[in-house]
Amino acid sequence: MPQISRQEYAGLFGPTTGDKIRLGDTNLFIEIEKDLRGYGEESVYGGGKSLRDGMGANNNLTRDNGVLDLVITNVTIVDARLGVIKADVGIRDGKIAGIGKSGNPGVMDGVTQGMVVGVSTDAISGEHLILTAAGIDSHIHLISPQQAYHALSNGVATFFGGGIGPTDGTNGTTVTPGPWNIRQMLRSIEGLPVNVGILGKGNSYGRGPLLEQAIAGVVGYKVHEDWGATANALRHALRMADEVDIQVSVHTDSLNECGYVEDTIDAFEGRTIHTFHTEGAGGGHAPDIIRVASQTNVLPSSTNPTLPYGVNSQAELFDMIMVCHNLNPNVPADVSFAESRVRPETIAAENVLHDMGVISMFSSDSQAMGRVGENWLRILQTADAMKAARGKLPEDAAGNDNFRVLRYVAKITINPAITQGVSHVIGSVEVGKMADLVLWDPRFFGAKPKMVIKGGMINWAAMGDPNASLPTPQPVFYRPMFGAMGKTLQDTCVTFVSQAALDDGVKEKAGLDRQVIAVKNCRTISKRDLVRNDQTPNIEVDPETFAVKVDGVHATCEPIATASMNQRYFFG
């Protein structure tokens, strides 16, 4: 077989096994672990290339014969479950149909089952791109619908959260309370080009108010201190969640009015729960809520304002807290409440615990102390800062950072999918799942996606002047694409609900046109099910200094003065 140099091959078909890719301007390098395509018969679109009639594209088989709708050729996949691999990705009926070698089995060897390219197939050239699952943000305050556009512009295509717009309750808590509000929000999100699951109010001792929200369509209960995060409220929310198989998320009691962190852990009664603000800067038992991350039944997340820990993190938190939680700077008790959350020691420990795989998920807390359009960016910045502070992870190979990168990718893809009961639909690049995918230029990985594929259609992309002679001339903006338009939006986006709501006919009763899918397996999971982030060490917090020890070792880092992928990526 004729041979070419590795450099020439990479120029034609992109990197292959053993090649390394730098991510943005970080010091993070991934290495392709395996290539599923084979060499010599690569599928390539374009003039004089292989995906032409009778060559790589079959000219006899119809779509009814299983031909792909879309193929992404020669792309580098970065996925928490698959690893870092090179492959073609086939899409059909809005789902991932195959990962491997695409083409025409009539003239090509080794074409993967279900990955035939034909007349019905369009192509995206992935030769010099990275493909990930689209991000999932599990901590959304539904304050403004425009959040969806900013999230898509950073590669996030699924929201879990609550609210009804800019009410004070929504500004402070991720809650859509009661059946009427839930119904209206289900109808409103029909026009959003992202998947959405709504959280109801879990602060109730009564069974009735909890059950009616599950039947109305929520995918979980949120117990928030602003509504009273008492032990009894937690117990009742968890019991009802067990009954209807939905998740419970908690923002615990910062003031320790109703008990301490030990009392809250006791109220969990060993049942599965998603803890928001596990670090405590965004709220929760002061100063030691971070201890819950050691519990096997706790699925811990934290939010992006303190990730990575920077020299300005502490200063900006105070004003955030005052605004979000309706506090008065002229009331000493309100000021003390805000100040109790701002603890540099626990913020530093939060960063370290993410790097160790102890805090398992990463979310935004959109417009309520966090930035909805910065999740992927903050994840890569944090991973890079932790490599600089802590060195290579023991799990990483000598020449790459694959494990660390995949650990952080899991925090915004598969782990929130598992936690919210939707990993059978989204969260990873796996055959059979909805084709919610993001393509990145490696130079902008984590900062600026090239395009977002939603349910098999491109619904968001960096696009040049629509009046230009090419797609590329400036000004290049993120713009909605055809997948986010008309009735296709409903076909390519999902509204997640409880099984109780689906059984009650919520789709018909609320007049929903989108796909409506029930969450499942929310109550039988534990931290052991979370990918690459399942560690449960002993965590202690000094009540005087707030120093955090993990298995007896002080967990801390210095705040960074500069971050990767920062000002040089964002002018203005």
UniProtKB/Swiss-Prot annotation:
Catalytic activity: urea + 2 H2O + H(+) = hydrogencarbonate + 2 NH4(+)
Active-site residues, record numbering mapped to chain: 325 (proton donor)
Main location class: cytoplasm
Residues engaged in binding substrate: 224
Pathway stated in the Swiss-Prot or TrEMBL entry: Nitrogen metabolism; urea degradation; CO(2) and NH(3) from urea (urease route): step 1/1
Catalytic activity, EC: 3.5.1.5
Co-factor note (free text): Binds 2 nickel ions per subunit.
Cellular component terms per the entry's GO annotation: cytoplasm
PROSITE patterns named in the record: UREASE_1, UREASE_2, UREASE_3
Keyword Metal-binding part of the UniProt annotation: yes
Modified positions (N6-carboxylysine) in chain numbering: 222
Protein name: Urease subunit alpha
Cofactor field: Ni cation
Keywords: Cytoplasm, Hydrolase, Metal-binding, Nickel
Family named by the database record: Belongs to the metallo-dependent hydrolases superfamily. Urease alpha subunit family.
Molecular functions (GO terms): nickel cation binding; urease activity
Species of the source: Yersinia pestis
Tagged with keyword Zinc: no
Binding, Ni(2+) 1: 139, 141, 222, 365
Protein's gene: ureC
One Pfam family per UniProt: Urease_alpha
Quaternary assembly: Heterotrimer of UreA (gamma), UreB (beta) and UreC (alpha) subunits. Three heterotrimers associate to form the active enzyme.
